[in-house]
Amino acid sequence: MKLNEIRDNEGSSKDRIRVGRGIGSGKGKTGGRGVKGQKARSGVAINGFEGGQMPIYRRLPKRGFNNIFGSEFAVVSLGRIQTAIDAKKLDASATIDAAALKAAGVIRRVKDGVRILADGELTSKVAFEVAGASKPALEKIEKAGSSIKLLAVAVEASE
C-alpha cells in the first residue's frame, strides 16, 4: 500500500445535499423549508422559541437562589492529598495549606478556602492549615497522627 492508494471506506462520507438548485433536483425552490413563515426565512432562529408551544424554560418552575453571603470552598479529599505526597508533589514535613495545594496542582482555585473530605486514606503524618474539614476527615487525620488547624473564613460585614 502506498500513500496515493489510500481511500476512504465505501459509504463513510455522504455528499452534502445542495438545496435550492432547481425543481428537478428534488430539493429546489423552497429547499426543504416548507412554504413561507418565519422558519422559511434566512437567519438564525429565535432562541427558546418552540413554534408557539409553551417553551421549556416556562414549563419548568423557578428553583433556588444565589446566596450572596455564601462561602464556596475548594474541596479536596484525603486520598488526593496522599497521592500528591506519594508523588512528591507535596512536602509532608511542611504545613499543607491552600497555597501549597494550589502549587502542587491538587486544586485549581482557592475560592473562599479549602475544605477536606474523608475520601481515601491518609498514611503520612502532616500538618494541615485549612478553612474546613468534614467530621470523618477530622477523625482520619487524627488517626494518622496528623494535626489540623481550622482557619476562620473571612466574611465581609455588610452595613
Curated annotation (Swiss-Prot):
Keywords: Ribonucleoprotein, Ribosomal protein, RNA-binding, rRNA-binding. GO terms for molecular function: rRNA binding; structural constituent of ribosome. Residues 1-37 are annotated as: Disordered. The keyword rRNA processing does not apply. GO terms for biological process: translation. Pfam families: Ribosomal_L27A. Residues 21-35 have a biased composition (Gly residues). It comes from the Bacteria. GO terms for cellular component: cytosolic large ribosomal subunit. Residues 1-18 have a biased composition (Basic and acidic residues). Belongs to the universal ribosomal protein uL15 family. Binds to the 23S rRNA. NCBIfam families: rplO_bact. Part of the 50S ribosomal subunit. This is Large ribosomal subunit protein uL15. It comes from Agrobacterium fabrum (strain C58 / ATCC 33970).
